Design a protein with these regions (language model features):
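SAM-dependent methyltransferase catalytic region
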Residues: 29-283
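Accessory nucleic-acid engagement/destabilization modules that flank
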Residues: 1-28
C-alpha cells in the first residue's frame, strides 16, 4: 500500500546515486568507492530511527543523533564518510595524486526528510503493543541487516509464548515467576510475555492497580540481554516506550552484553548472577 511504499523509501530508496556520464577511468575511481559505501546503507536507516530517531530528525542532523561508533558498526562507514557523501569535499585521486572535488549531494533531501518523518509517525502509531487491534508490526518495516539484526516476526513470538504456556500451564499466573531473553533482537518476545503477565488473573489479583502491576512485571519478572548497542536501544525503546510511556522510570532489567560470546567463554551464568542476581533473589 502507499504507506508501505512511503516507509520503504526510508529504508530502500532514500539514497539517490548520482548518474552522470564520466570517463571509464573515473568510473573506476571515486564513483565506485561511493557506490560501495552506499551499498546497504539505506537499509540501515529504519534501524537507526527505531533506536535514535525523534521528530525533527533530518538529513542535516542525521549524523549528530547517532553515536559515531554505532554508526560505523552498523553501516561500515564512518560519520565523516557519510558527511562526504552528503556534503561533498576534496579527495586525492589514488592513481594520479591529483586533488579533485566530489560534489556530494547523493541524498535527495526532500525525499529523505519526508520519509524519515513518515517512519517516525508510523513508529508512534504502532508503538502501543498492548493494543490488540493493531494488525501491523513496526518491525515489518525494518529491513534486516547483519545476522544478529534479523527480527523475529510477531506471529513467531506469539507462538513461542503460546507453546511455553502450553508446556507450563499457569506459568504467567504466579507473580514470583521470572522470564528472560538472553539474546534480544527487537524486544518483541519480551513484550509478548509482558502482555501475558499483565493480563493474568493471578497477577491482577496480586496487583489490582494497573501501574503497580506493570511496574512489578518490569522490575521483577522480565529480564533481557542485547548483543549490540543499537539492538539494545531498539529493544529497550520498544519495550519501555519510545518516550518511556510504558516504563515510566521503573527499574527495568535489560543489559548490553553479547550472551553468545559469554556462553562460549563459559561466563554467562556468572554474568547473569552478577547483573540480575539480586532481582532474581527477590522474585
Amino acid at each position: 500500500d502507499s504507506r508501505e511504499e512511503l516507509v520503504q523509501r526510508a529504508g530502500e530508496t532514500v539514497v539517490r546515486e548520482v548518474e552522470t556520464a564520466k570517463k571509464e577511468d573515473e568510473k573506476q575511481g571515486i564513483e565506485d568507492k561511493v557506490r560501495a559505501h552506499l551499498r546497504g546503507f539505506s537499509r540501515t536507516i529504519p534501524s537507526f530511527l527505531m533506536a535514535y530517531g525523534e521528530e525533527g530528525t533530518t538529513l542535516a542532523n542525521f549524523d549528530t543523533v547517532i553515536p559515531a561508533d554505532v554508526f560505523q558498526d552498523v553501516t561500515s562507514i564512518t560519520v565523516d564518510e557519510f558527511r562526504f557523501l552528503r556534503d561533498g569535499g576534496d579527495y586525492t585521486d589514488g592513481e594520479t595524486g591529483e586533488v579533485k572535488r566530489f560534489v556530494g549531494h547523493l541524498f535527495d533531501e526532500v525525499v529523505f526528510n519526508d520519509s524519515v518523518s513518515e517512519f517516525i509517525k508510523l513508529r508512534e502509531r504502532l508503538a502501543n503493543y498492548f493494543d490488540e487491534s493493531q494488525t501491523e508490526d513496526i518491525f515489518d518495516y525494518v529491513p534486516p541487516q547483519k545476522t544478529n539484526q534479523i527480527f523475529t516476526p510477531r506471529n513467531v513470538g506469539v507462538q513461542m509464548v503460546d507453546l511455553f504456556e502450553k508446556e507450563t500451564p499457569g506459568c504467567f499466573d504466579d507473580p514470583s515467576h521470572t522470564f528472560a531473553d538472553l539474546y534480544m533482537k527487537s524486544g518483541l518476545y519480551i513484550t509478548e510475555i509482558i502482555k501475558r503477565l499483565y493480563r493474568s488473573e493471578g497477577t491482577k489479583a496480586a496487583f489490582p492497580d494497573d501501574r503497580e502491576r506493570l511496574d512489578h512485571i518490569l522490575e521483577h519478572q522480565v529480564f533481557g540481554i542485547a548483543p549490540t548497542k543499537i539492538i539494545y536501544e531498539i529493544a529497550t525503546h520498544f519495550i519501555l516506550g519510545f518516550h518511556d510511556e510504558v516504563g515510566q522510570g521503573c527499574d527495568s532489567n535489560f543489559e548490553l552484553a553479547d550472551a553468545a560470546e559469554l556462553a562460549k567463554e563459559g561466563t554467562l551464568e556468572a554474568y547473569v548472577e552478577r547483573v540480575f542476581g539480586p532481582k532474581l533473589g527477590e522474585a
